[in-house]
């Protein structure tokens, strides 16, 4: 920035020297007065002005772009630290629009308009000083135009600011709609909803068009008004200056120099006016960015997590709701002993997935606490705590990239040997080896190039690579065939050994072998015990097992009555 200001000063100085040379030439004009040195000085001043202007413009633009890059980086890092609750209430498209469109408006301001503003201010300030030095009376006449310009520009600026805010909001809505439709394009096509989505898109685009037209009207008025004011000012100055010359109060060369300085002041003033017009537009974008940056980030915590294998995971009278007046978990109170498997079953909407979210610290309990080894998990270092958790979800999300990228996502220093061992344990070796590029095969957006069972096996392999202390499974084998399930279940049995494991289960085979079963109903635990104990003591569990849990045809009917499963 300092170098840019130096270049700007040199450019301004070079531009302001020319009218002085012109004054001397006009006042004492003769062929003898035109010396080669004078011509060389004038040419040198023009060259210095051109080169200095280019260097100053580049340096100022570079500095401005660095500022925008810093804002984008800060915004991106802030997104990564925002709690999950923020993403529950805001669309991904809206947040993406803040990072791309809003910062793009800032880039236009600081990268395109700011350089002209800085050089314009320097030229205008120094030029006005020379104008007062040449003739202070005509300078006062010139300054009389400022209130007239402000009377027009201030209301227009307010209109543009309000319009810019509406444009940013509408652009964010369009980005959100685009992200929603494109990410679920298969659902759109399968539902025959193209016409509906076309209409939604047309309405949003039409709204942007109307706002852009309003902004264009304001912008189209600015330049003509400024041009009219400056032309009137120039006519007045020339007329009044002619009277001053005829009266002898000002020389002809002084009038020429005054007009040249006036032009050098008028042109920067136009740039400054355009800059402040763009500032009004950027205010809307800036307000949105500041609003995002003001959102509180996740509490990272500082307490180190106790060594692996020591802790008991405890839900201590936990109450939680996604909305203030609607509790999802109601006084949840249970413990998971080290090395044991606990299965959570119950009707849909009872809060099973929410339990997982609280363990991961995606949300904080409204009251009560989730404890590990006697400590509130909210006090643990967040990165350390989550590194101790392995999660195999039911939908098994994947990132666009290769199979290797997804297996090692968030895990540093994974060797090929460790990777293939995990792949083998998850029964994924055969299908990965059959792919043309093996683990380097691209899985596509959200893993669309793989089947559900393949995605699930990759999620299991990723959990194996994490070597977690706490393992959370959301019906981890639901998408596998019988043969694959047996192989993967064996790998999971190995993985679960010595670890605290929590399973959301819909299959009878998954829950029968659990050390403890929790029946979660409407946010409360209404039954706990082994499969056999709950069959005898919990009527709703028995009904649920008969009607909702799916099991293989090889399982005998007596497995429901005595708590055993054939083949286990």
Locations of regions flagged by a protein language model:
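Short intracellular "coupling" helices and adjacent cytoplasmic loop segments at the cytosolic face
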Residues: 65, 73-97, 101-105, 176-200, ...
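Alpha-helical segments in transporter systems
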Residues: 1-20, 24, 38, 42, ...
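Hydrophobic alpha-helical segments in the permease module
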Residues: 42-53, 146-153, 219-233, 252-274
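ABC-type nucleotide-binding domain
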Residues: 308-568
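Transmembrane helices of ABC transporter permease
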Residues: 1-10, 112-166, 237-250, 267
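Transmembrane helix-loop-helix hairpins at lipid-water interfaces of multipass membrane proteins
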Residues: 2-55, 59, 132-137, 247-252
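An intracellular "coupling" helix at the cytosolic face of ABC transporter transmembrane type-1 domains
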Residues: 84-85, 101-110, 114, 118, ...
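Cytosolic ends of transmembrane helices, especially the final helix of ABC transmembrane type-1 domains
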Residues: 193, 217, 265-292
């Amino acid at each position: 920035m300092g170098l840019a200001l130096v270049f700007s000063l040199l450019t301004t100085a070079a531009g302001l020297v020319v009218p002085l040379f012109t004054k001397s030439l006009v006042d004492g004009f003769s062929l003898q007065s035109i010396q080669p040195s004078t011509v060389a000085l004038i040419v040198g001043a023009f060259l210095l002005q051109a080169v200095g202007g280019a260097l100053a413009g580049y340096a100022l633009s570079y500095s401005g772009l660095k500022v925008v890059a810093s804002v984008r980086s800060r915004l991106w890092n802030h997104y990564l630290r925002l709690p999950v609750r923020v993403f529950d209430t805001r669309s991904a498209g809206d947040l993406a629009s803040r990072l791309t469109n809003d910062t793009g408006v800032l880039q236009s301001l600081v990268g395109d308009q700011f350089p002209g503003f800085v050089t314009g201010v320097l030229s205008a300030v120094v030029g006005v000083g020379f104008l007062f030095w040449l003739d202070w009376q005509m300078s006062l006449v010139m300054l009389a135009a400022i209130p007239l310009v402000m009377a027009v520009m201030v209301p227009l600026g307010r209109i543009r600011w309000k319009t810019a805010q509406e444009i940013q909001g509408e652009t964010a809505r369009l980005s959100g709609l685009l992200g929603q439709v494109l990410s679920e394009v298969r659902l759109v096509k399968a539902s025959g909803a193209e016409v509906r989505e076309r209409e939604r898109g047309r309405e949003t685009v039409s709204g942007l068009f109307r706002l852009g037209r309003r902004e264009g009207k304001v912008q189209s008025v600015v330049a003509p008004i400024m041009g009219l004011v400056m032309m009137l000012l120039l006519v007045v100055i020339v007329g009044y200056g002619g009277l001053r010359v005829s009266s002898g109060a000002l020389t002809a060369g002084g009038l020429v120099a005054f007009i040249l300085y006036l032009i050098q002041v008028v042109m920067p003033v136009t740039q400054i006016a355009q800059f402040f017009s763009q500032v009004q537009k950027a205010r809307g974008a800036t307000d949105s960015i500041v609003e995002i940056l003001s959102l509180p980030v996740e509490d990272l915590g500082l307490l180190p997590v106790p060594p692996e294998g020591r802790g008991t995971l405890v839900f201590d009278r936990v109450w939680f709701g996604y909305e203030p007046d609607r509790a999802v978990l109601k006084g949840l109170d249970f413990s998971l002993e080290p090395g044991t498997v606990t299965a959570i079953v119950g009707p849909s909407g009872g809060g099973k997935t929410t339990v997982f979210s609280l363990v991961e610290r995606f949300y904080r309990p409204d009251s009560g606490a989730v404890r590990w080894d006697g400590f509130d998990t909210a006090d643990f270092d967040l990165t350390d705590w989550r590194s101790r958790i392995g999660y195999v979800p039911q939908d098994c999300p994947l990132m666009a990239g290769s199979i290797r990228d997804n297996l090692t996502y968030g895990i540093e220093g994974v060797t090929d040997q460790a990777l293939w061992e995990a792949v083998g344990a998850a029964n994924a070796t055969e299908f990965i080896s059959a792919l043309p590029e093996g683990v380097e095969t691209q899985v596509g957006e959200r893993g669309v190039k793989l089947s559900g069972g393949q995605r699930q096996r990759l999620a299991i392999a990723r959990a194996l690579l994490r070597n977690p202390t706490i393992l959370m499974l959301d019906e981890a084998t639901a998408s596998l065939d019988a043969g694959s399930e047996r192989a993967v279940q064996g790998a999971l049995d190995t993985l679960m050994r010595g670890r605290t494991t929590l399973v959301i289960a819909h299959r009878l085979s998954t829950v029968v072998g659990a050390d403890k079963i929790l029946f979660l109903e409407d946010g409360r635990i209404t039954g706990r015990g082994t499969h056999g104990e709950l069959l005898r003591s919990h009527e709703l569990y028995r009904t649920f097992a008969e009607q909702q849990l799916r099991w293989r045809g090889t399982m005998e009917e007596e497995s429901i009555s005595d708590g055993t499963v054939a083949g286990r």
